[in-house]
Regions:
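Alpha-helical transmembrane segments and their helix-helix packing motifs
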Residues: 1-153
Length: 153
């Protein structure tokens, strides 16, 4: 059993927390997004209440656009992915460059989704890249404590 510094433990925890937030957020908001694509109103207000985030959106389309892609909103998935990337860069020596690259790929896919009119495919790439990141953590991080801190997040 090794010793992990408080700073490193914090970064590992938040890396796991932010990647989980993006993954779970995309999965849970999919029915709301689908409703918006179909021209219906999804129950985004209930989702916001459950997470304790401000429900200051005008409609389902506005919610999806801003919740997914507004990097100026600390509650958005794009912000969470940026925070995950920031932590991953600092932890490059622990994670390995190959593992870090999956977070970069997810960030690139999120950016591509934000720029397109039909973001569903690129958002699926974000999910795929986060799952690949998790798998890479299992395969390349040999210290159980380090892997556990990421999973704890």
């Amino acid at each position: 059993m090794g010793i992990i510094s408080l700073n490193k433990a914090s970064r590992l925890y938040w890396l796991g927390r932010y990647t989980e937030r993006v993954y779970t957020g995309l999965k849970k908001v999919k029915p709301i997004y689908d409703a918006g694509v179909d021209g219906q109103e999804g129950d985004y207000a209930a989702y916001c209440r459950c997470l304790g985030i401000p429900g200051h959106y005008t409609d389902t389309v506005d919610f999806c656009k801003r919740y997914f892609f507004d990097r100026n909103d600390p509650n958005s998935l794009a912000s969470s992915l940026a925070y995950a990337y920031d932590n991953a860069v600092v932890l490059r020596d622990t994670l390995t460059t190959d593992t870090l690259s999956y977070i970069q790929l997810a960030a690139n896919a999120m950016e591509k989704a934000a720029q397109g009119d039909s973001p569903a495919v690129a958002l699926q790439w974000v999910l795929d890249d986060i799952l690949a990141f998790r798998g890479a953590c299992e395969e390349t991080i040999f210290e159980e404590e380090t892997r556990s801190m990421i999973k704890l997040g």
